[in-house]
From Swiss-Prot:
It comes from Salmonella dublin (strain CT_02021853). Keywords: Protein biosynthesis, Transferase. It is an enzyme of class 2 (transferase). GO terms for molecular function: methionyl-tRNA formyltransferase activity. This is Methionyl-tRNA formyltransferase. Attaches a formyl group to the free amino group of methionyl-tRNA(fMet). The formyl group appears to play a dual role in the initiator identity of N-formylmethionyl-tRNA by promoting its recognition by IF2 and preventing the misappropriation of this tRNA by the elongation apparatus.
């Protein structure tokens, strides 16, 4: 293509690999790929390459895996590639200002939210957690702040009542490459129109933790149902019964008022396990005891009915 750009790609997980794959079929020239060092994974803790590294090596691209880009010799790896632009997607390393300034057109990032909403580490999960009606991707010019750069392009998608973080991740992994290719075309032909973020609209997407995913029955049923979808597939909402963690895969909200204390089991039938919350009733539909597969409430009641006796309270 006549407006082909020399591109350095920096990314690590599958989400990033999907963007690299789109670049490789776009007519641009990917001159080098930066990704995180191989990490131990699986039961055997064998060193495993990132999805981005696997794809890059399949395509015969030069791969670089520095632990940090702060050392001068690692920054020189970037400089020696003489790139027009560096594309960063879920890379996992901080880019020092010296690196941000190296490419002719700077560095651009694909972020999984409609900035300035949900800057930070967990934008997909927080959009579900908060009950947002839509989310999307933002392609932005990177600066030294955390997701603070000027916005170059946005694509939105609705959030449905059935979406989990896993399903939303897949939707944004389709949108992101579309937005990236459009943005690169605009950068190449000089039509990109950077837009500053409105600081008054900023929200921060804090990292998730397993402790946050423990079900707090004092919250409303609506909030808990959103948490269950937001924390799926990680870290998974959970409750503790007889000292065992039980993951919750699916639940629904029953708006009926109840005078029972939060955590009180109201009913346990094949239609679900109904539990009082701070507001409304949460109907547990699919659960996973430790060491078992996920199962319907009915199947769990067949083997563990003593866990869910109406009138008892869950911790």
């Amino acid at each position: 293509m006549s407006d082909s750009l020399r591109i350095i790609f920096a990314g690590t997980p599958d989400f990033a690999a999907r963007h690299l794959d789109a670049l490789l079929t776009s007519g641009h020239n990917v001159v080098g790929v930066f990704t995180q060092p191989d990490r131990p994974a699986g039961r055997g803790k064998k060193l495993m390459p990132s999805p981005v590294k696997v794809l890059a090596e399949e395509k015969g691209l030069p791969v670089f895996q520095p632990v940090s880009l702060r050392p001068q010799e690692n920054q020189q790896l970037v400089a020696d590639l003489h790139a027009d632009v560096m594309v960063v997607v879920a890379y996992g390393l901080i880019l020092p200002k010296a690196v941000l300034d190296m490419p002719r057109l700077g560095c651009i990032n694909v972020h999984g939210s409609l900035l300035p909403r949900w800057r930070g580490a967990a934008p997909i999960q927080r959009s579900l957690w908060a009950g947002d009606a839509e989310t999307g991707v933002t392609i932005m010019q990177m600066d030294v702040g955390l997701d603070t750069g000027d916005m170059l392009y946005k694509l939105a998608c609705p959030i449905t009542a059935e979406d989990t973080s896993g399903s939303l991740y897949n939707k944004l992994a389709e949108l992101g490459p579309q937005g990236l290719i459009t943005t690169l075309k605009q950068l190449a032909d000089g039509t990109a129109a950077p837009e500053a973020q409105n600081e008054a609209l900023v929200t921060h997407a804090e990292k998730l933790s397993k402790e946050e995913a423990r079900i707090d029955w004092s919250l409303s049923a609506a909030q808990l149902e959103r948490c269950i979808r937001a924390f799926n597939p990680w870290p998974m909402s959970w409750l503790e019964i007889d000292g065992q963690p039980v993951k919750v895969w699916q639940a629904s909200v029953i708006e009926d008022a109840t005078q029972s204390l939060p955590g009180t089991i109201l009913a346990a039938t094949k239609q679900g396990i109904q539990v009082a919350t701070g507001k409304g009733i949460l109907n547990l539909l699919s659960l996973q005891p430790a060491g078992k597969k996920a199962m319907s409430a009915q199947d769990l009641l067949n083997s563990r009915r003593e866990w869910f006796i109406p009138g008892n309270r869950l911790a």
